[in-house]
A protein has these predicted regions:
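PRPP-associated nucleotide enzymes
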Residues: 1-300
Length: 300
């Protein structure tokens, strides 16, 4: 029984088949193809959920999600769940200044809630605000990605004793602590950063002393989102100042990488992410032609 509608990968053998139409004015629509009808009409009596799998990077994605949900309802599906590993606007979880808005609370959540999904699954959300605002929210942690990364970083016995997890700031500490607890890693350090209040530019990054760390320690920075990557580059620089030969790895659930990989590739021995936002097949080399060790976990 086809119980998945995969908007990211239409060739998914488990997905029902559909057609997307796009009009000159930008409107999109979706049609469930005829040979799926009997399968879905049978769900009237046995309401097995149909799961819509999609990215939610922009309003075009949101439009297709709504169209897919309504198309499924049109052919009799009673229960629809939504799987969106990344949710647009996850960082805009509060009003940043007077005259502004809480984007998640006042824009995204009301639209998603209007669709009455039986469940909305999001992976490694930026904060608890998303969970508080979206009905029937289900949080997926980053364990699958971290396991994928750690197995590539060090797969030998007692690897957990050679890993130091790095929280990029105090806000990420609980998330990193949960990772440490899950994988039996004892060493965690938490960085702090000072920003220019007007520009948002990072003025200074500070980490605790690393002098007691053995030379075989690998530093693994864990966070939910990498946009331009400046936070992580500055953090890696500070670690390198004290430990010039340190091996540093970056594990981020949602990789935007808006500034590319030139600078990230200079400072990181490995970069690990999912394809929640986009599929990345070629990251090239760093600015000094250093090969970039980049690995992406497919979650669609």
């Amino acid at each position: 029984m086809a119980d998945i509608l995969n908007l990211v990968n239409p060739n998914d053998v488990l997905s029902c088949k559909y057609e997307i139409s796009r009009f000159p004015d930008g409107q999109q629509s979706i049609r469930i193809l005829q040979h799926n009808y009997n399968t879905f009409y049978s769900l009237k009596e046995q309401p097995t959920p149909v799961i819509i799998k999609s990215r939610l990077n922009n309003f075009q994605d949101l439009e297709l999600i709504i169209c897919a949900n309504q198309a499924l309802k049109e052919i009799g599906v009673k229960s629809v769940k939504l799987y969106i590993p990344y949710c647009i606007g996850g960082r805009s979880d509060r009003k940043f200044q007077e005259g502004g808005i809480n984007y998640i609370k006042t824009v995204i959540a009301p639209i998603l809630n209007s669709q009455n999904f039986d469940e909305v699954r999001v992976m490694d959300p930026h904060s608890d605000v998303l969970e508080a605002c979206i009905n029937n929210f289900f949080k997926l942690n980053n364990t699958q990605l971290v396991k994928f990364a750690l197995s590539n970083i060090d797969n030998k016995d007692y690897a957990q004793d050679r890993i130091c997890l790095v929280s990029p700031d105090a806000g990420a500490y609980k998330k990193v602590y949960d990772v440490a607890k899950w994988f039996g890693i004892k060493e965690i350090i938490t960085a702090s950063k000072v920003r220019d209040l007007d520009s948002g530019k990072i003025l200074k990054t500070v980490v605790p002393s690393l002098e007691n760390h053995n030379d075989d320690i690998k530093y693994v920075i864990v966070d939910d989102i990498c946009d331009g990557g400046r936070t992580f580059v500055e953090l890696a620089k500070v670690i390198k100042e004290e430990k010039p030969n340190a091996k540093i790895h970056l594990v981020v659930t949602h990789g935007i990488f808006s500034a590319g990989f030139d600078e990230l590739g200079e400072y990181f021995d490995g970069i690990y992410t999912t394809n929640s936002i986009k599929d990345i097949s070629d990251v090239g080399t760093s600015s000094t032609l250093k090969p970039i060790n980049f690995k992406q976990l497919n979650i669609f």
